[in-house]
């Protein structure tokens, strides 16, 4: 029996599966075959929810006496766009000049391929694992993230599963393998503001109420002053206006409605609830103190809608998990990785409620891009890091 010790072969098998969210595309089946070669038991639960597609997931475990390590990730990928723009077909796993091309190469089929290879090498050398390893893999990370990791964790917990630590194999390195380990993430909160006015002719503004004035005023109240100056482990909270829309193509008509959407990435100065309260306070004050039209007595009329579920800020403090991974990275790459909380959200935001979690994978320079690709040398390097981590974590 040949174990899946080669990360290049593993990744090629996964890339050739067109698993664009929500399609499974054969990726979980390919992964399950690799894991069963190593004696893992596997389940493929499918989760559903209103107004979202059904999603297939995978939970596989190889049990032993000792701590339980979870590797988490996703096999779904974003659409490749126009395939004519690619140097090589996005699902062909073509190799040229020591580089493999394909959608998901770094985000994050590459990380999965390397961890599979690392486990296989450990088993090949040592015969067993002094503990348990599980793979918690979803097909719903790039999509709504409703029927994926969040439900798979609860599903596993209800069946008696618990974990001592987790690694998420997202591409964490900005420039080169070994740059960065993610030990936490900022929270994320999104909302939409709608201001109602009175439509009218642009030449007769006294007969109308321009909601654009109101939306600009309210948005400005959220942009200034700054929410905070950052903390010891997190950069300053940051709000970005992502859309402003009036739905008006005519240049001589004052619209009757204006909307603006925003997203704020926040640090541990705030909880989602305290930040929502701060935003509401700023908007109410700005609406009360300003008008849509000079001489108008009533305040700005607006509605605030929170979009999606907020992601909560978190920071991992587990010394064994962080220290062992840091030492493994340094031993293989010769670099001491930065411990960071930068970047966007990931499924680690769900895992943190079940066990300590960190993130470490490939470099992310080409993720989601045309010609997404990974150096074969990086696949081997990441596999060696994971293999060393497994050996040291289980002692």
Swiss-Prot record:
Its EC number is 3.5.1.18. This is Succinyl-diaminopimelate desuccinylase. PANTHER family: ACETYLORNITHINE DEACETYLASE, N-ACETYL-L-CITRULLINE DEACETYLASE. Zn(2+) 1 binds at residues 74, 107, 170. Its cofactor is Zn(2+); Co(2+). Homodimer. The active site is at 76, 141 (proton acceptor). Pathway: Amino-acid biosynthesis; L-lysine biosynthesis via DAP pathway; LL-2,6-diaminopimelate from (S)-tetrahydrodipicolinate (succinylase route): step 3/3. Zn(2+) 2 binds at residues 107, 142, 368. It catalyses: N-succinyl-(2S,6S)-2,6-diaminopimelate + H2O = (2S,6S)-2,6-diaminopimelate + succinate. It holds the Pfam family M20_dimer. Keywords: Amino-acid biosynthesis, Cobalt, Diaminopimelate biosynthesis, Hydrolase, Lysine biosynthesis, Metal-binding, Zinc. Belongs to the peptidase M20A family. DapE subfamily. It comes from the Bacteria. GO terms for molecular function: acetylornithine deacetylase activity; cobalt ion binding; succinyl-diaminopimelate desuccinylase activity; zinc ion binding. It is an enzyme of class 3 (hydrolase). Binds 2 Zn(2+) or Co(2+) ions per subunit. One of its GO terms (biological process) is lysine biosynthetic process via diaminopimelate. Catalyzes the hydrolysis of N-succinyl-L,L-diaminopimelic acid (SDAP), forming succinate and LL-2,6-diaminopimelate (DAP), an intermediate involved in the bacterial biosynthesis of lysine and meso-diaminopimelic acid, an essential component of bacterial cell walls.
């Amino acid at each position: 029996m040949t174990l899946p010790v080669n990360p290049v072969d593993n990744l090629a098998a996964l890339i050739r599966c067109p698993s664009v969210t929500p399609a499974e595309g054969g990726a979980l089946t390919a992964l399950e075959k690799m894991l069963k070669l190593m004696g893992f038991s596997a389940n493929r639960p499918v989760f559903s929810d209103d107004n979202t597609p059904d999603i297939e997931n995978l939970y596989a475990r190889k049990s032993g006496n000792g701590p339980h390590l979870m590797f988490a990730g996703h096999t779904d990928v974003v659409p490749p766009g126009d395939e004519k723009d690619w140097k090589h077909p996005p699902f062909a796993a073509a190799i040229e000049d020591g580089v493999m091309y394909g959608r998901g190469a770094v985000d994050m089929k590459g990380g999965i391929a390397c961890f599979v290879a690392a486990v296989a090498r450990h088993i090949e050398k040592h015969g067993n694992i002094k503990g348990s390893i599980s793979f918690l893999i979803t097909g719903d990370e790039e999509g709504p993230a409703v029927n994926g990791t969040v439900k798979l964790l609860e599903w596993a917990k209800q069946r008696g599963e618990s974990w001592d630590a987790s690694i998420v194999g997202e591409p964490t390195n900005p420039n080169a393998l070994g740059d960065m380990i993610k030990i936490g993430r900022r929270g994320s909160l999104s909302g939409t503001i709608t201001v109602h006015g009175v439509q009218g002719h642009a030449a007769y503004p006294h007969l109308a109420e321009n909601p654009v004035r109101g939306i600009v005023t309210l948005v400005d109240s959220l942009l200034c002053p700054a929410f905070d100056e950052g903390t010891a482990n997190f950069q300053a909270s940051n709000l970005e206006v992502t859309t402003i829309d009036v739905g008006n193509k005519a240049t001589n008509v004052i619209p009757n409605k204006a909307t603006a959407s925003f997203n704020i990435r926040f640090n541990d100065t705030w909880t989602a609830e305290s930040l929502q309260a701060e935003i509401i306070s700023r908007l109410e004050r700005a609406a009360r103190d300003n008008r849509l039209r000079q001489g108008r007595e009533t305040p700005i009329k607006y509605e605030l809608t929170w979009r999606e579920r907020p992601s909560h800020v978190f920071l991992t403090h587990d010394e064994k998990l962080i220290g062992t991974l840091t030492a493994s990275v340094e031993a293989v790459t010769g670099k001491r990785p930065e411990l960071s909380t930068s970047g966007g959200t990931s499924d680690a935001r769900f895992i943190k409620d079940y066990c300590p979690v960190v993130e470490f994978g490939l470099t992310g320079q080409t993720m989601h891009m045309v010609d997404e690709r990974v150096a074969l040398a990086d696949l081997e390097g990441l596999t060696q890091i994971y293999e060393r981590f497994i050996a040291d974590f289980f002692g």
